[in-house]
Amino acid sequence: MNGDIAVFAGNSNKQIAEEICTHLGIQSGKINLKKFSDGEISVKIEDNVRGKEVFIVQSTSAPANDHLMELILIMDALRRASVSSISVVIPYYGYGRQDRKVEPRVPISARVVADLIEVVGLDRILTMDLHADQIQGFFRVPVDNLHFAPVLAEYVNTKKIDDLVIVSPDSGGAERARAFGKKVNGSLAIIDKRRPKANVSEVMNVIGEIEGKNCILLDDMIDTAGTICKAADVLLKHGAKSVYCAATHGVLSGEAVDRINSTQFSEVVLANTIAIPESKKINKLKSLSVAPLFANAIQRIHTNQSVSTLFD
């Protein structure tokens, strides 16, 4: 990698940024990030970046508002420093779940965040497993949406799990589960959630054969872990031999870690798109690095090669 490229990291996930730089064979850019006494964010770029192709690595994870504001201030500082281009690497795109109006008088937050980022000025977005594909259309610049599936499939295949079933926790994720099943030679099952009538508890039914099978619950994120833990209990109740869980983004808010710990998961596998604090690291959690994938994509962008061929 030549000296015409620079990678800067915000505070949200410095570890993945450093791993990306290691794979690219460069040092991360020097940046001074701090807060004033009133809570406002201060940004100063310490390197000369004039004419450089710049990549900013920043997930908009919790605290989402601070990390989002930090990102757009870094973007503005670099733009005013006369860089040649800005690509924003957002391993986890926060506010992505509010991608449409589901009831009257609510915002489409994913679009608002896209507008905020775009109005500051950038040339490209690089992200991973957006909650909704239509978010790519909220930007007028190119959006490369990378996928955790190849990294996860390689890991699962090394475990050599027999009688494998990939389970979608809802009907909306069935296509994701089916596609992943082809990568790991697993069959498909779906958990169908229904509420028979008002004020009656939600009922979970399993569509597919899971008795005596090893199941992997597959989702794009784990937030409070309520749904995924209930789904695991249902699978075990229906005779599953073991239950694993895999998701790209480990949001792990609220009592998520306690719920995971008290559920009979064999293992919960996450990408490292969100930094997990030490207080939330438990034996059941396994983190797989997607830094090499991001580094490869950055290399391809820099050399004007196809990014999509990474997943052919």
Curated annotation (Swiss-Prot):
GO terms for biological process: 5-phosphoribose 1-diphosphate biosynthetic process; purine nucleotide biosynthetic process; ribonucleoside monophosphate biosynthetic process. Pfam families: Pribosyl_synth (PF14572), Pribosyltran_N (PF13793). Mg(2+) 2 binds at D170. It is an enzyme of class 2 (transferase). Its cofactor is Mg(2+). ATP binds at D38, G39, E40, R97, Q98. Binds 2 Mg(2+) ions per subunit. The active site is at K193. It is found in: Cytoplasm. SMART domains: Pribosyltran_N (SM01400). It comes from the Bacteria. One of its GO terms (molecular function) is ATP binding. Belongs to the ribose-phosphate pyrophosphokinase family. Class I subfamily. This is Ribose-phosphate pyrophosphokinase. It comes from Leptospira interrogans serogroup Icterohaemorrhagiae serovar copenhageni (strain Fiocruz L1-130). The gene is prs.
